[in-house]
Amino acid sequence: MVKNYWLMKTVSVILNGYKRNHTLREQVEAIENQTHKVDTIMYWQNTSQLRYDLSPLVDGGHDIAVSTKNYGVWARFAYALNAKTDYVCVIDDDTIPGDRWIENCVNTYETHPGLLGTIGLIFENDTYGVLGENRFGWDNNNTEVKKVDIVGHNWFFHRDLLSVFWRELPSVDESFLVGEDIHFSHMIQKYTDRGTWVPP
């Protein structure tokens, strides 16, 4: 019973579309074939000049929201508030998860709660410089869970952490096109005792 505890954890995946219409079908297939089954796939699309074939989402009965404006990278975290699962996984449109990614995240979260991602950075100094050896994840594999300053491309977290993400709102003068990765990790560091991690 304890061995299969992770199987009871529910997960929503948030996909987004903006610049890479060629990856959507492969992403949906990868998520539908996870070893830990995903409960809901939710798709957010900012306005785009590219034409998107949404049939993989329609055929699978997945949730779709298409905006007539570009609300940037932060909008998908607002859309994630609609998730009704234990965990949420937000995936960039340039990322195809391996078939055990969700299983790996659920298992890792049991011992390393917080924010998990596919690429993690450790900053060298106050100017946020990063050397190649301080990048971890798919392009610099780590064999153990690695604590990092920020993660990107894929964010896996308990749904409750959405309230931490939105605890401080960015200024209306700030761009919503970047910065969600630093903001999320900063909010977790500032308001919780959890960390930012890259699973092995």
Label each residue range with its predicted role.
Residues 92-96:
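The conserved acidic donor/metal-binding loop of glycosyltransferases
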Residues 50-83:
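Active-site-proximal specificity loops/subdomain of glycosyltransferases
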Residues 38-49, 65-66:
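Short beta-strand/loop segment that forms part of the nucleotide-sugar
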Residues 29-38:
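Short, acidic, metal-binding catalytic loop of nucleotide-sugar glycosyltransferases
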Residues 177-183:
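Acidic donor-binding loop at a coil-to-helix junction in glycosyltransferase catalytic cores
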